[in-house]
Regions:
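Bacterial N-terminal signal peptides that target proteins for export
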Residues: 2-16
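Sec-dependent signal peptide cleavage junction
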Residues: 22-42
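A detector of low-complexity, intrinsically disordered, Ser/Thr/Gly/Pro/Ala-rich segments
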Residues: 9-10, 29-33, 56, 73
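Long terminal segments
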Residues: 41-73, 121-187
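Glycine-centered structural positions embedded in regular secondary structure
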Residues: 4, 28-29, 170
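Mature extracytoplasmic domains of secretory-pathway proteins
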Residues: 78-125
């Protein structure tokens, strides 16, 4: 009986030590870094999910929105007093347009959440997609179809290329849209 008690105590001590060391970030294979990565992944997934929800809802309800043309290349869609969607076609005279690129901006609660842009050259189409949340870019897909996911998001200063250009133009667009439509009660 004494041997079995010692064996149980030894096993208990080993299990207890294993539990203690498993919780230690220095020794545990599951460190705080993987926790941070998981949280970052959850944020980027949330940004993409919100953008998709906004995109599908906007496309579904497009005919219900108030359509306002701003010049020959820009069309805004309003739901009550909120801008929900803008389409900007290429025009050398329009500083909001991007050369040879049709841009679609999707807004939720007056914030840019998704930008879709495309360039047509003959039969070839180049597409760009950028997913935003809280002023940061969480995912970008360029014409090479390569998905760039930024777990903790990229601020405007750290964005590059088309993701940065779309963010800048999309935010400038919403500011101008609210200023232009203030007199008719859309602000």
């Amino acid at each position: 009986m004494e041997k079995s008690v010692k064996k149980v105590m030894k096993t208990t001590a080993i299990l207890l030590l294993a539990l203690i060391f498993a919780g230690s970030p220095a020794i545990s294979p599951i460190t705080s870094k993987t926790t941070i990565e998981a949280e970052a992944s959850a944020k980027s997934d949330k940004a993409v999910k919100n953008a998709r929800k906004c995109y599908y809802s906007t496309r579904k309800n497009l005919r219900r929105y108030k359509k306002v043309r701003n010049g020959s290349t820009s069309t805004d869609y309003w739901s009550k007093n909120k801008l929900v969607f803008s389409e900007i076609k290429p025009d050398k005279r329009d500083f909001l347009s991007i050369k040879n690129t049709v841009c679609e901006y999707y807004y939720s609660k007056s914030k840019l959440v998704f930008a879709f842009a495309y360039q047509k050259k003959g039969r070839k189409v180049k597409e760009y997609r950028a997913y935003y949340m809280s002023g940061k870019c969480y995912r970008y897909i360029g014409p090479d179809k390569k998905v760039h996911t930024y777990g903790s998001g990229k601020s405007y200063e750290r964005m590059s290329g088309m993701a940065k250009k779309l963010y800048q133009k999309g935010n400038h667009n919403i500011q101008l849209a609210y200023e232009a439509n203030e007199p008719i009660g859309n602000k």
